[in-house]
């Protein structure tokens, strides 16, 4: 049994774990491993917003343009494509890329092809919305958890290997305990989301400044290779409960500290649905996320269902990744998006 925290990220604890040293988890789970070379990763959520069937093809073309830009020098190591409908009834396509080298991501973002497209006046007149939500956590600022050991999705795809069975799971507080930084840091938030350019109510170009320790969770489900019994388990038992919880956070998450919640379905380049989905949630802090997870009936139902089936999973692939990041390592930029998109809803106007 291994610790979720890799050897080179271990340090003397000043903050204790939630369980005693002799704790034994009830079923096996694994985490992604990377060597000491990995100092920081970049998680880029690049969105296209549209409304209704009339704009769908133009939105797909814009999504495909973003994907093609990933083939430029310094593009991401892995990416995926998703669709979701938000709380305001808008459709959103997201291209999600992961870089294991922040300098490469910076070069890509500043390249003429990428920068000129984003800053072009054409973006303002196409009838589509665009957004960039980028977080770059350091190695000690994120954790992963998988119920399987191969072909890891998301940030796991830029890591080097999979751990052996790990200790820190199956109890409330285990998410925090898997963060290397949790050994010495409570990961408390600073400040508020602030509008630093533009006006969300007017649309156009808007830039939001984040704050330290925004928590970002991606929690995924892959039933593409599952056989009939597991497909039924997911579609009939897990999904309805999951959908209820995720819709609740999408529509009612603000008082709980949830800035944005999107339950997305993976798609191909033509917009066809795949049998893969995940939830992506931005929270004011890890503590706010924990409080909801440990106490709200919608998540408790999800947790109980997972506990009941976890030990018997064969081809149904369930996982999550959670990170916090520094304000200086975040980008939140929007073009023509409605004012409840992403970080726009909860951002306050910066004092002048």
Curated annotation (Swiss-Prot):
GO MF assignments: lyase activity; metal ion binding
Catalysed conversion reaction: an aliphatic aldoxime = a nitrile + H2O
Superkingdom: Bacteria
Cofactor note: The substrate is directly bound to the heme iron.
Keyword field contains Heme: yes
Impact when changing residue 178 to A: Retains 19% of wild-type activity with butyraldoxime as substrate. Significant decrease in heme content
Binding site for an aliphatic aldoxime: 219, 320
Keywords assigned by UniProt, alphabetized: Heme, Iron, Lyase, Metal-binding
Summary of activators and inhibitors of this protein: Active when the heme iron is in the ferrous state. Is very sensitive to AgNO(3), is also inhibited by hydroxylamine and phenylhydrazine, and hardly inhibited by thiol reagents. Not sensitive to chelating agents and serine-modifying reagents.
The protein's Enzyme Commission number: 4.8.1.2
Keyword flag Metal-binding: yes
Catalytic residues (UniProt): 320
UniProt cross-references to Pfam families, sorted A to Z: Dehydratase_hem
Described purpose of this protein according to its UniProt entry: Catalyzes the dehydration of aldoximes to their corresponding nitrile. Aliphatic aldoximes are more effective substrates than aromatic aldoximes. Shows high activity with butyraldoxime and acetaldoxime, but only weak activity with the aromatic aldoxime pyridine-2-aldoxime. Cannot use benzaldoxime, isonitrosoacetophenone and pyridine-4-aldoxime. Is involved in the metabolism of aldoxime in vivo.
Similarity remark: Belongs to the heme-containing dehydratase family.
Stated name of the protein: Aliphatic aldoxime dehydratase
Species of provenance: Pseudomonas chlororaphis
Record gene name: oxdA
């Amino acid at each position: 049994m291994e610790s979720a925290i890799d050897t080179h990220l271990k340090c003397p604890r000043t903050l204790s774990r939630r369980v005693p040293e002799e704790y034994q988890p009830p079923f096996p789970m694994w985490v992604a491993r990377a060597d000491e070379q990995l100092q920081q990763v970049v998680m880029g959520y690049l969105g296209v917003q549209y409304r209704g069937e009339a704009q769908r093809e133009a939105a797909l073309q814009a999504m495909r343009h973003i994907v093609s830009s990933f083939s430029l020098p310094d593009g991401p190591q892995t990416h995926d494509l998703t669709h979701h409908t938000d709380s305001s009834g808008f459709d959103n396509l997201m291209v999600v890329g992961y870089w294991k080298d922040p300098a490469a991501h910076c070069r890509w973002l500043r390249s003429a092809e990428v920068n000129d497209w984003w800053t072009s006046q054409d973006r303002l007149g196409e009838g589509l919305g665009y957004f960039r939500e980028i977080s770059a956590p350091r190695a000690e600022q994120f954790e992963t958890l998988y119920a399987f050991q191969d072909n890891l999705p998301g940030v796991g795809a830029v890591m080097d290997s999979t751990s052996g069975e790990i200790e820190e799971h199956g109890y409330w507080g285990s998410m925090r305990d898997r963060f290397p930084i949790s050994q010495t840091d409570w990961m408390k938030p600073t400040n508020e989301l602030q509008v630093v350019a533009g006006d969300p109510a007017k649309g156009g170009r808007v830039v939001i400044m984040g704050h330290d320790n925004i928590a970002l969770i991606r929690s995924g489900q892959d039933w593409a290779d599952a056989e009939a019994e597991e497909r039924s388990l997911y579609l009939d038992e897990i999904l309805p409960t999951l959908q209820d919880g995720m819709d609740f956070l999408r529509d009612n998450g603000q008082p709980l500290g949830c800035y944005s919640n999107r339950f997305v379905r993976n798609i191909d380049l033509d917009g066809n649905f795949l049998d893969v989905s995940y939830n992506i949630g931005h929270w004011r802090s890890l503590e706010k996320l924990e409080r909801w997870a440990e106490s709200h009936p919608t998540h408790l139902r999800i947790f109980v269902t997972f506990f009941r089936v976890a030990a018997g999973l064969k081809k149904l692939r369930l996982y999550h990744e959670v990170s916090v990041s520094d304000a200086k390592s975040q980008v939140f930029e929007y073009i023509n998006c409605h004012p409840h998109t992403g970080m726009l809803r909860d951002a306050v106007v910066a004092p002048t």
